[in-house]
Structure formats: structure tokens, C-alpha cells
Amino acid sequence: MSQQVKVYRQLDLRDKTRVTTNKDMIIIDDEVVSKRTQTAVTNTATITAAQLITGILDGTPTAGATYTLPTAALLVAGIYNVQVGSSFFFAVNNKAGDAYTITVAAGNGGTADGTLTVAQNVIRLFLVIITNVTSSSEAYFVYGIE
């Protein structure tokens, strides 16, 4: 019989000015802290806001692949109580059977910088920062962290 183990993260909120919660995420000051789940992705795909926010994209491409992030409008709409400066991390895990590379591309309204490719058997971390939440002008920046 298997036993489930629950892990809880303790947060010291004494020096925080604003904490917001809903069923899917916690926002502390402007940083989104969400439940982490894995999303299986194979070849070239457009990633949804929900998949991105929950944190881990497990890639098993059978050729070179591009994972396009959601548009800024969809991403802003997908973050509860979003504000300029809201941010979160996500990871791309390239579990390809051969030497196929995954490239992360910003969606419409997004800007990307840093290393955006993930080689076979590599896990790369990315940081997303919301830079505009105004309707029809939504924007974000995504950094590929080396």
C-alpha cells in the first residue's frame, strides 16, 4: 500500500505588505506562488496560461520544437489579481530521446531575453515578469536563466 506524503512550504509573512490567495495560487507582494504541477508537452506547441503558471513543462520532442508562451492578454487574464511587477518562475525539462532542442518563444505582447533554448537532458528555469496590465496593452518579459 502506498502512502501519500504532503509537503507544505512555510512562509514568513511578517515583512510582506500584501498577501492574496485563491484556489490556484498565492500572491505575496507581487510574486505569484502557485501549486506546481507537470504538463507533458511533445512537439511544437502553444502553452496555455494555466500550464505556464503551474510551473513545469516536461518536454519529449521527437524533433526540434518551439514552445510558444501565451499572449500577454491571455497570461494577464490567467493570473488572479495581477499587477505590474507580478512574477513567477517556470521550468522546461527536455527529456527527448535524441539530441532535439526545445526553443521557448514569447507570445504576442511578450518580450524574451537570455538563453531560450533547452538542450536534451537539460532543465532550464525561466522568469516571467508582468510589465503592463492595461487592457489591449498587456505585456510581459520572460528571461531564460542560464
Question: In which residue ranges do the predicted regions lie?
Answer:
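Sec-dependent, cleavable N-terminal signal peptides
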Residues: 1-3
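Short, solvent-exposed loop/linker segments at beta-strand-coil boundaries, enriched for Pro/Gly
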Residues: 108-111
